[in-house]
A protein has these predicted regions:
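C-terminal substrate-binding/cap subdomain adjacent to the FAD-binding core in PCMH-type
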Residues: 142-144, 148-158, 162-377, 410, ...
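N-terminal glycine-rich flavin-associated loop
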Residues: 11, 35-67, 85-131, 143, ...
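N-terminal flexible segment immediately upstream of the FAD-binding catalytic core
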Residues: 1-62, 72-103, 251, 255-269, ...
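Iron-sulfur cluster-binding cysteine motifs and their immediate structural context
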Residues: 509-514, 545-568, 593-620, 797, ...
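Activity-critical C-terminal alpha-helical subdomain
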Residues: 382, 483-532
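Iron-sulfur cluster-binding electron-transfer modules in prokaryotic oxidoreductases
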Residues: 505, 611-936
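Non-heme iron-sulfur electron-transfer modules
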Residues: 516, 553-586, 607-633, 919-928
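Ferredoxin-like iron-sulfur electron-transfer modules
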Residues: 522-542, 574-596
Length: 936
């Protein structure tokens, strides 16, 4: 069925065209979330204000159009997909208000969970929920799912730390529980609804058997069904309503803002890994630890340990553990080091009577801690990495009463064996009896679907009926467990949930078939295919963890969406379906606007670099190999041509003036489809070719200086206050520190190959790289001298897969911190400095080092929030300027009190200067300004 014409007409008047999507590519891309279900929406709307949400809900109510809300799309149970209208959050939902020295924080639903904690960190506080997806998931989803996590338990989830909420009901009515005027207006307009909620609360509390059941169920971690505990925990109907919205998964209303009572984030922590000989011993230890000063206790069965035993950094003994071994990863936190040590002694004393097979003692070392927690965090992706192409990874989420945890674990393992899930692993938040089990599942045949159905029926019977546990502890009911809500809760509680749903959403327009469904087979419908597409991306589980760092997300596609569309294209081709229209749209949205810098790989739990797929696809369309060969073998001429182009651009600026040239250039770029680069105010002037011969008899320590080709071509912008070139500044700083600067021979013909690689000419790129490596070996006297490269992208290109261990290569950050700190005296400036950590700096592992260097140089360092990749991507800032503009759309406000920024990439600095409204320079400019040579 299509959407009503009246709804579409009025929605078009309400929402601009650029925020409405109904084309096949966009609806498929947005139709995907992290669950193993898929629905294709008929219309996707990106909303930027509460007023728009209100108006859309009023339209949906009028025309009986179902709507679903989406924040980050990282939920796992099918609660954020729709075959009707999908409403997704735009940029303008990132507001915050920190109160009372961080003891409270008010957040809009588009804030990423980790960002909220970053804001609270200076106060030693954090929000209570700590889901594994906290670096990607957003507050809207955290609240709507009542997400918890490893340390959160039940006491610190959203329900129990809720201080206030702003919501929109299905009829478009707003309520802000922290605004007296809003509350008064709501009481006047919705008095009967509030009285009905109060009545349901009274009758529930009066039903002693039902009330006792509700209290018992929420003693455990539980997100199955609606939050009935609101009816027994509160008398005031506004409190009931606000807490019903928590965990409602978008079925009762839209959450516009939430205020949390924050929790203490203790600075001192230690972790240990203790392996017990069997499940029973391990779970008995959990019972003891529940009364100990522990912040997290994670259980890992033998299968989960086996899945990561070959990973780097794993304790060697993991490979030799016995067949029934079961481990606990324990963390304790405290306000002081002395208190932490007391707690650790107390914890170990409590476990003294238990037999232990192996253990890693408590450590406070951050790196060792990270290694231990990597065991836990790598288990889920470990299954994903070995799954058969075409199957999906399913992670289920149940709770047993802690005192029955050992029996529950063994019974689950029996079900794995019964239904032939041999690869299934089991781990979880042991203190709460909350277990996750991960397995691979194909849905390509009725036999596989039937196997899954039989398994889930057995799991539901085991957990909900035999043990009285929770079928969803923290992942939300979604579609996945909707058919089992009545089985877990019983008829009285189930009907009570339906009463609440019909009271708050009488026309059933809010996320139908989620949490509550009249279809007993809903969990077996709309199962998502994961067809083979390319071995580079076939392991993708579509979790969405990559999306926050992608510069094109919100402009075109995210890495997850690129993979989704490419999978669909390949599946259609195999089925003989025409894909020309989809591929034509994908060329721009999937290929042309991908920065291909690979930050997505850093966030991906299975290490997928979607940029590599894009480069591969570009190579298939790279039809000018002969030209690339000529450019590579005549590189000095190529650079001279680039300098000439900059001369022409600079002349045009002086002739036409910057405003007219900018307008003309934008038109030419658009008409030429990116073939003519777009001019902007930060466009560099041409740099003269380097002419430099060091003294032969120089006795100073040598450093080989590799000036990247962009540094050799691009000088400062005409309007830049700093008119010294990067080469001049770098050479001056190195000599100030007492180094003899040596340049490779034939420098103007040398290149790392990055310009060729980014265009899909891999052969020419590698030829140039190898030529440069040979020149650097010669210049460094066989690797005797360190090699300084003045841009981090060039350094990264050289060190990746570097076979020759003789070369000692440095980017600016690493060289300054390892070679120059001891030779220079720093006098930090008071003027604020903005820092952009480039993608390559992140890949090189120098992010924190760059920030620390900046703090040596300035007492006021500004790191803009939410900008991970600038989107300039070599030359895309010239040819696809909208990518750079989109990625840096928030930069100007973030750096408004700075007069200068620093980076480690000359091309990135062009876009940063243009969109930040301040001059960005290389790190060496700042270091040179605030240092002098130390007296010998």
């Amino acid at each position: 069925m299509s959407l009503p014409a009246a709804f579409l007409r009025d929605a078009q008047q309400l929402i601009p065209q650029e925020r409405r999507f109904d084309d096949p590519l966009s609806t498929l891309a947005f139709g995907t979330d992290a669950s193993f279900y898929r629905l294709i929406p008929k219309l996707v709307i990106r909303v930027e204000s509460e007023d728009e949400v209100v108006a859309l809900l009023q339209l949906a109510q009028r025309d009986r159009v179902p709507v679903t809300f989406r924040a980050a799309g990282t939920s796992l149970s099918g609660q954020a997909i729709s075959d009707s209208v999908l409403i997704v959050l735009g940029d303008n939902w990132n507001g915050k208000e920190i109160r009372h020295q961080g003891s409270q924080i008010r957040l809009q639903p588009g804030v990423i969970g980790a960002q909220a904690n970053a804001w609270l960190a200076p106060f030693g506080r954090k929000i209570g929920p700590d889901p594994a997806s906290i670096n990607a998931c957003k507050i809207g989803g955290i609240v709507a799912n009542n997400a918890s996590g490893m340390c959160c338990g039940t006491a610190q989830n959203t329900y129990h730390t809720l201080a206030g909420i702003r919501l929109v009901l299905a009829d478009g009515t707003r309520l802000d529980t922290e605004d007296e005027a809003s509350v008064s207006a709501f009481r006047a307009s919705h008095g009967p609804l509030l009285e009905r909620l109060a009545e349901l609360g009274r009758s529930t509390r009066a039903n002693s058997e039902l009330a006792a059941k509700i209290r018992h169920k929420y003693r455990l971690k539980n997100t199955t069904g609606l939050s009935l505990n609101a009816l027994v925990d509160f008398d005031e109907p506004l409190d009931i309503l606000s807490h019903l919205l928590v965990g409602s998964e978008g079925t009762l209303g839209f959450i516009s803002a939430v205020t949390y009572d924050t929790v203490i984030d203790h600075p001192n922590k230690a972790s240990a890994l203790i392996v017990f000989p069997d499940v029973e011993t391990c779970c008995n230890a959990v019972t003891v630890l529940k009364s100990q000063p522990v912040s997290a206790v994670e259980l890992l069965d033998r299968r989960s340990l086996r899945s990561v035993q070959d990973k780097p950094g794993m304790p060697a003994f993991v490979q030799q553990l016995s067949a029934n071994a079961c481990a606990l990863l324990i963390e304790s936190r405290a306000a002081s080091s002395s208190l932490l040590h007391e707690q650790l002694a107390q914890i170990m004393n409590s476990l003294a009577a238990f037999p232990v097979e192996k253990q890693v003692d408590f450590t406070e070392d951050p790196q060792e801690n990270a290694k231990l927690w990597a065991i836990r965090k790598d288990t889920f992706p470990a299954v994903g990495a070995v799954r058969k192409t075409g199957t999906t990874v399913i992670i289920e989420d149940v709770t047993f009463p802690v005192e029955q945890l050992a029996i529950g674990v063994n019974r689950l393992i029996e079900l794995f064996d019964k239904h032939h899930y041999d690869e299934a692993i089991l781990f979880g938040h042991a203190l709460e009896g909350n277990l996750h089990f991960v397995f691979t599942q194909g849905f390509n045949s009725s036999e596989e679907v039937n196997r899954y159905q039989a398994f889930m029926d057995d799991v539901a019977q085991l957990v909900a009926v035999e043990f009285g546990g929770s079928l969803k502890a923290e992942h939300g009911t979604g579609r996945n467990m909707a058919p089992f809500v009545e089985l877990e809760w019983g008829s009285d509680a189930y009907q009570l949930m339906w009463q609440l749903k019909r009271l708050l959403d009488p026309n059933a327009i809010l996320n139908p078939d989620v949490v509550l469904s009249e279809d007993p087979q809903i969990h077996l419908k709309h199962l998502k295919p994961l067809p083979a597409a390319d071995e580079i991306v076939d392991k993708c589980i579509e979790c969405g963890f990559c999306e926050p760092v992608c510069p094109s997300k919100g402009l075109t596609l995210s890495p997850r969406q690129r993979i989704v569309i490419w999978r669909d294209i390949q599946a259609r081709k195999r089925a003989g379906i025409d894909t020309s229209e989809l591929e034509a749209a994908y060329q721009y949205q999937g290929i042309d606007t991908c920065a291909a810098t690979g930050l997505c790989a850093q966030r991906c739990p299975v290490g997928i670099n979607t940029g590599e797929l894009v480069k591969k696809l570009r190579s298939e369309h790279a039809t000018h190999s002969g030209t690339a060969d000529w450019l590579g073998s005549h590189f000095a001429s190529t650079l001279q041509g680039a300098r000439f182009t900059l001369h022409v651009a600079n002349g045009a600026r002086m002739l036409l003036g910057a405003p007219r040239l900018s307008k003309l250039s934008a038109s030419l770029t658009r008409l030429s489809k990116g073939r003519v680069p777009q001019w902007n105010n930060a466009m560099p002037q041409p740099e003269k070719a380097i002419r430099f011969s060091p003294s032969v008899s120089d006795a100073r320590p040598r450093v080989v200086y590799l000036a990247a080709c962009v540094s050799r071509v691009m000088g400062p912008a005409a309007g830049d206050k700093e008119q010294s070139s990067l080469y001049e500044k770098t050479r001056g700083l190195l000599e100030k520190a007492g180094y003899q600067v040596v340049l490779p021979d034939n420098l103007d013909n040398l290149c790392c190959g990055q310009p060729f690689a980014s265009k899909g000419y891999a052969t020419q790129a590698e030829d140039k790289r190898q030529e440069l490596i040979g020149a650097l070996l010669h210049a460094s006297r066989g690797g005797l001298d360190p090699i300084y490269c003045d841009t981090s992208p060039c350094t990264l290109r050289l060190v990746q897969d570097l076979g020759d261990v003789r070369l000692d290569l440095y980017d600016p950050v690493r060289f300054i911190r390892t070679h120059l700190l001891e030779r220079l005296e720093f006098t930090p400036q008071e003027a604020p400095i903005a820092v952009h950590v480039t993608c390559s700096t992140q890949h090189l592992g120098e992010s924190q080092a760059l920030i620390e260097l900046a703090r040596r140089c300035s007492n006021n360092v500004v790191i803009p929030e939410g900008i991970h990749c600038c989107g300039f991507a070599g030359d895309k800032g010239f040819t696809t300027p909208e990518l750079n503009a989109h990625s840096l759309r928030s930069l100007k406000d973030a750096v408004q009190y700075c007069s200068e920024g620093i980076s480690t990439s000359r091309t990135c600095e062009i876009g940063l200067s243009q969109h930040g409204g301040i001059d960005y320079h290389g790190l060496v400019y700042l270091v040179d300004r605030v240092t002098r040579a130390k007296a010998v």
